[in-house]
Regions:
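Short secondary-structure subsegments characteristic of cysteine-rich extracellular domains
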Residues: 277-294
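Substrate-binding/catalytic groove segments of enzymes
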Residues: 262-274
Length: 318
């Protein structure tokens, strides 16, 4: 029978059903409370991220299409929390799987502020961890932009890439080369490759002095000669009076990182990669930390755009 560690005591998850657990109003023998937090290594989610056709991991939940769903607290870097009562609802095979990642909590481990607000205070709130917060901000931002301008800044992903948003996440371990590359690829497809180039192009004012200067730097006489989505986006920003070279440079660097996978980084072209290593601090921090920072900067990018173009909707929170 699958078991869970609760304060170093093993309990049978299969037997700890809702009707056998204690709650804040009724004690049921020595059995623990329904909402007792059970801790798991965050790698427990890898199985579900890797099979998006069958499973969905989202802010506060993980589930199997048409079979089961589980409330979770995934607003942490290295672990996931599940209230004990929900574990009892899993089918036996899933209980065994989760058991393999069960850990006893350390002193600094606890329920996130997000989960506390939702579970204890029964209030709605945004997640705080970079990947979850970015995905929430991205959807909200694109909707606000379309409401404001009549067209979305980011187009929907093509069918074969629809899973990219669904599975986009921070790393569950400090370093995972293949997963790091996969997340950078997903981020690039979701943001940079999805720029609504047709609508962006139509809004560029070639007579704007800043646009003229930008085109001259590229040896172009018209914005219609621009091919890359980022180039068009930068010209659009200049046309609107927004000059944010650092923000655009960040997007370009992410795109370059996408083009330089682990295999490329192991090549001899170190000079081509030196600036990327330095910019993202890939030699100083773990891939997990680097990716989290990229998510944070992507959120900052969206907030910067919202503050400039839609100040009436901006909450200025990062």
């Amino acid at each position: 029978v699958a078991q869970a560690l609760i304060n170093n005591v093993k309990y049978s998850v299969a037997e700890l059903r809702k009707d056998t657990l204690s709650n804040y109003f009724v004690a049921n023998g020595d059995n623990p409370l329904e909402m007792t937090p059970i801790f798991f290594k965050k790698e427990v989610l890898d199985k579900y991220y890797s099979n998006p056709n069958k499973y969905t991991v989202s802010d506060g939940s993980v589930g199997c299409e048409g079979s089961w769903s589980l409330y979770i607290d995934n607003d942490h870097r290295s672990y996931v929390i599940v209230p004990l009562v929900y574990l009892g609802n899993l089918e036996y095979s899933e209980q065994l799987y989760w058991k393999g990642y069960n850990v006893s909590p350390e002193k600094d481990m606890g329920v996130s502020k997000t989960a506390y607000t939702r579970w204890k205070e029964v209030n709605i709130c945004n997640p705080m961890f970079p990947d979850l917060y970015f995905k929430s901000c991205f959807k909200q931002f694109n909707k606000k932009w379309e409401n404001q301008f009549g067209w979305p800044l980011f187009l929907p992903l093509v069918e074969e890439d629809e899973h990219r948003y669904k599975t986009l996440h921070c790393l569950t371990t400090e370093n995972n080369h293949s997963d790091f590359d996969e997340q950078i690829l997903s981020m690039t497809k979701l943001v940079i490759d999805s720029f609504n180039q047709k609508c962006i192009q139509s809004e560029i004012d070639d007579s704007n002095p800043d646009v003229e200067s930008y085109l001259k730097q590229k040896n172009f006489s018209s914005s219609t000669e621009l091919k890359a989505g980022i180039d068009k986006f930068q010209a659009f920003l200049l046309s609107e009076g927004m000059n944010c070279p650092d923000m655009v440079d960040f997007l370009r660097k992410v795109q370059s990182l996408r083009s330089n996978s682990v295999a490329h980084r192991k090549s001899n072209k170190r000079k081509d990669l030196a600036k990327l290593y330095e910019y993202f601090k890939l030699d100083e921090f773990s891939e997990q930390q680097v990716l989290e920072d990229i998510f944070v900067k992507m959120v900052r990018t969206l907030k910067t755009l919202e503050k400039f173009f839609m100040p009436q909707t901006s909450d200025n929170n990062e």
